[in-house]
């Protein structure tokens, strides 16, 4: 009888030890799994941001225009619309500034003379995004301009140039809405024999904005 009790006690003790070992093994496995997950998260967090793909702009693909340019800033608005500072166009111009233009594959920085202002409708005239965009497209193309983009840059391009773009948007606030990433914005270039004229147009539902930049012809892309 005493032997049976002893064997029973030993059996219970063995079962308890096995149970404890399983718990320890499970705890160790959980710890290892958590550590692996933490390492994976750390690896994902530390992964560098993807660099934007750059497609160099080739000005030689744009025909040279010799059509006469109107008085600065070259772009006349359609009837029923006016520049916000129509009485002080010179005040909206800078003799030398550095501004970005999105070519559809490259953020190109242009140094030269600039003009920027908001576009408003006259009193009694309802602003039409379609009307402004269509008429300005016709006006710019009549000067030999070519539209090279209808959207702004992507998020990766913005992130790679965030400080410079934010500084620009603060200085040129009339056209800032065209310089969010993935925004509606038309970009045109008028290639002259000795210079390039860039036009960035943003048209919203109630008003718009425009940037005109005149600078040297960009360098040809490296072969």
Annotated model-derived regions:
Residues 1-8:
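Bacterial N-terminal signal peptides that target proteins for export
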Residues 9-15:
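Bacterial N-terminal signal peptides
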Residues 17-19:
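C-terminal motif of bacterial Sec signal peptides marking the signal peptidase cleavage site
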Residues 21-223:
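An acidic-aromatic pocket/loop used at catalytic or ligand-binding sites
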